[in-house]
Each structure stands twice: as C-alpha cells, then as structure tokens.
C-alpha cells in the first residue's frame, strides 16, 4: 500500500529537470553521491575478473586452455555471491553492506597485488614464461583470491538498491539516469584500460591501484553515504533535505 501511495504521489509531483536538480544545493549533493556510488561500483574492478579472468590466469602460468576452463569458478562464485546477497541486503543496513563489500574487496585486491609482487613477478622470465622454481600453489592462489573477490562483490552490491531509494521522487528520473549513465561510462573505461595496465605495469601495480581506489570507496561509505533502509521514502527525502540544505 505504501508503494502504491508513493507512486501516486510521484505521478502528481512536479518532475525537476537536471538543471533544477543541479542548481539546488541539497539535491545536487544527492546527485553527486549517486554518481560516486555508480562510479565506485565499477572501480571495484569486478569486470577485470568477469571479463578478463583467462588473461589473468594465463599471466600467472596457466595454459590458455586451462585459463578458459577455470573461468567457470568465478561464475560459480558469482552465482553463490548473488544468492547470498539477497539475504545480506535484507538482513543488514545498506551502509553496513557497502562497508563490508568495500573492506572485503580492499583486502582481497591488496592480497592479490602482494601475490603478484612476491609470488609471480620474481619468477617471470623475459620471454613471458615462468621459472620452474615458482611454487605450484601460486596460480591456484590467484584463482582462489579472484573467486573470493567476485563473491564479496556480488554478495555486497547495494548500489542498485540505493539508486531506487536515495533520490527524491521529483529528481528520481534524472538522478537515476545520470548515476546509471556514469556507472556504464566507468564500466567502459575500466574494461578498456585494464588490458594495457596489466600488460605494462603488471598485476601487482594494477591490483594495487584498484585496492587503493576501493579503500577510498570504503571511506566514502563510512563518511558520506546516508542510510536508507530504516526509513520510508518520504522520511529519506526529509532527512536528506535537512542534512544537505
């Protein structure tokens, strides 16, 4: 009944243009939070694992055929993570889920960077192959860490829920459009820059950069992102207007 009433009120409410939303102090801050959430969602580096796992595994010594076959493990981790996420977002506060996600990803990617730095790079030879001295567990360790990373990301995703709850009714259309647009632009950028990054800088630097970005995202969730779960949509709008005016 609440959603029916909210939908009725939104239909009757004047819709703001992007210019109106941007020129009003409190709604501009909400737009910026939405944009940042969308961008950080892609800057987790999740698509580097979903799109390029065979390339990553090949870079640590797996054969091309095995690299493609082992990609199924991240798919399994993604499915389990998505299922777990349904329970997580219903059980915990939105901010807490976001903090869990970013903290977990920061740890996973920092660990992955260290494995590349100390377990992979010292054994890589000039022709791109690896010394027989490289511990046999290292490639499998990379696979396990990437699978954990994918699981954490999929089980802790709250961005799409925030998109539906964060924006007041009068700017929900333009707010969602702008935030989602920025999300997909960032998706394209990360997808395009990852191959040359790992080729030129190596896995340690590449994933070190993504870990640092996720640490910034963690601070953003802790310091900036408001809670929305325990309030109605009207209460969220009233609270945000008071906070950001």
Question: What is each of the regions a protein language model found here?
Answer:
Residues 4-245:
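Alpha-helical transmembrane bundle of multi-pass membrane proteins
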